[in-house]
Regions:
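Short, surface-exposed recognition loops and adjoining beta-strand edges that mediate ligand/DNA contacts
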Residues: 61-82, 159-172, 208-300
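Membrane-proximal, proline-rich intrinsically disordered regions
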Residues: 10-67, 247
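Sec-dependent bacterial lipoprotein signal peptides
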Residues: 1-8
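Flexible, polar/acidic helix-loop-strand segments at domain edges
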Residues: 87-90, 165, 169-170, 319-374, ...
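Extended ligand-binding clefts on enzyme/binding-domain cores
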Residues: 252-355
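Conserved, well-structured interaction surfaces
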Residues: 32-35, 39, 44-48, 52-56, ...
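Short coil/linker segments at helix-helix boundaries
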Residues: 134, 158-189, 193
Length: 402
């Protein structure tokens, strides 16, 4: 999403960062107040907290992001007729929109989960936490922080760049601590500088882990390279040579397009699980295996592995007529049938109720939320080739994805 959304229309409630600074595990060392986590186990809880936050970010970092991206690109209607969603679709939102406030606060909270690791992992006195683990955990946390800052700057333009944890406020330190509790917004250029710094730091030797074919729910070097390709394609002064450079770095990590597009989303015939996780095309996906499951699937339609699931309210992200027409114009039934499913709900907000389209990719509670896949990066690289005049190379990449 290249355009900055809501930058001028909203006056957001910048809740104090201390709201997100509660340390639930560990405590202050009586001999060194700078040490919050004294054991490897305590620090591991904070590291694991990053991935738990990602799994739990289904509302702000997935459903809401889809609303903001897809309705503004005319790929979808918001679906529900609630005032918050309708104003977002119509771009008439203001500072009273609770969804925006919710996402703003959530994103600052995600950044704080990263900062807990970044700022504390090197201070843990427990030597069973190895230097290799410290470097890797910090690198993964920096990728997470950079990713959230990237989404924030694209949505809101100038945003706070929070890299420190706020200490407890007292009468003696109020002037020093106040800017940490109520951070001011930084110019877009400064935000992008922090994003690039974090991602480059994560790519240093001994930093982020290499790709793991059996676990794509991992903030790897490939994720950092993919994000850098996106960053250089969307920052105010774009650098398409770097887009190509980082896209090629992703390709060199061995990802492959899946032979069957349905492999990314399909469930098995028994409807007891998805057919595949961690495909060769996936770069980063949030997994929800049997025994856990996501809840966000029912925001878009029914849960196709649950026979009791019903269309009980007007769902989010209704595919638009423009999107459906685009598929039909290309004769692309393969992708359309994996992206859109038709149902018969009780409402007719955008279509007749006897033939109503719903988003289909996240079709069950067992489906992963695929945040980055190879096709995204190949098409981004193709765009960079177009911008640099290499139309033949761009066409070859587009045809590969097709």
């Amino acid at each position: 999403m290249g355009a900055v959304l809501f930058a001028t229309s909203c006056s957001l409630d910048q809740d104090p960062i201390s709201d997100f600074s509660e340390i639930t595990v560990g405590g202050k060392d009586t001999t060194d107040t700078s040490v919050k986590f004294k054991t490897k186990e305590e620090m591991k809880t904070q590291y694991d907290g990053i991935y738990k936050a990602i799994q739990n970010a289904q509302e702000a970092w997935y459903a809401d992001m889809l609303v903001l991206n897809e309705t503004h690109s005319d790929n979808a209607y918001c679906g529900s007729s609630g005032a918050e969603l309708t104003s977002l679709e119509q771009q008439t939102q203001d500072g009273t929109n609770k969804n925006i406030e919710r996402d703003w606060n959530a994103f600052l909270g995600y950044i704080n989960t990263a900062n807990r690791v970044i700022n504390n992992v090197d201070l843990v006195p427990d030597q069973s936490l190895t230097q290799a683990e410290r470097k890797q955990w910090k690198a993964e946390a920096k990728i997470w922080r950079a990713w959230i800052l990237f989404d924030m700057v694209r949505l809101w333009g100038d945003v706070p760049v929070v890299t420190e944890e706020a200490p407890d406020i007292t009468a003696e330190n109020v002037e020093e601590v106040y800017p940490l509790l109520y951070p001011s917004r930084k110019p877009v250029a400064e935000v992008y500088a922090q994003i690039i710094s974090d991602l480059n730091a994560a790519l240093k030797p001994g930093g982020a882990p290499a790709v793991n074919a059996g676990n794509k729910f991992l903030l790897t070097k490939s994720v950092a390279n993919a994000l850098l390709a996106r960053v250089y394609a969307e920052k105010p002064v774009r650098d398409y040579a770097k887009v190509i450079q980082y896209a090629e770095a992703v390709q060199n990590d061995g990802f492959k397009l899946v032979p069957d597009f349905s492999d990314l989303f399909s469930v098995n015939d028994a409807k007891t699980d998805v057919n595949f996780r961690n495909t060769s095309e996936s770069i980063f996906e949030v997994t929800y295996p049997v025994g856990s499951g996501n809840w966000v699937t029912w925001m878009f339609g029914i849960d196709h592995v649950d026979p009791n699931s019903t269309y009980n309210w007007a769902k989010w992200i209704t595919p638009s007529r423009d999107l459906i027409q685009a598929y039909e114009n290309e004769g692309d039934n393969v992708r359309m049938n994996q992206a859109i499913v038709w149902g018969q709900p009780s409402w007719s907000n955008h279509y007749p109720s006897d033939h109503y389209p719903f988003m289909y990719k996240t079709r069950s509670k067992y489906n992963s939320i695929i945040k980055i896949r190879l096709a995204d990066i190949l098409l981004l690289k193709a765009e960079a080739y177009v911008e640099t005049g290499n139309l033949q190379a761009a066409a070859a990449l587009v045809n590969t994805v097709r």
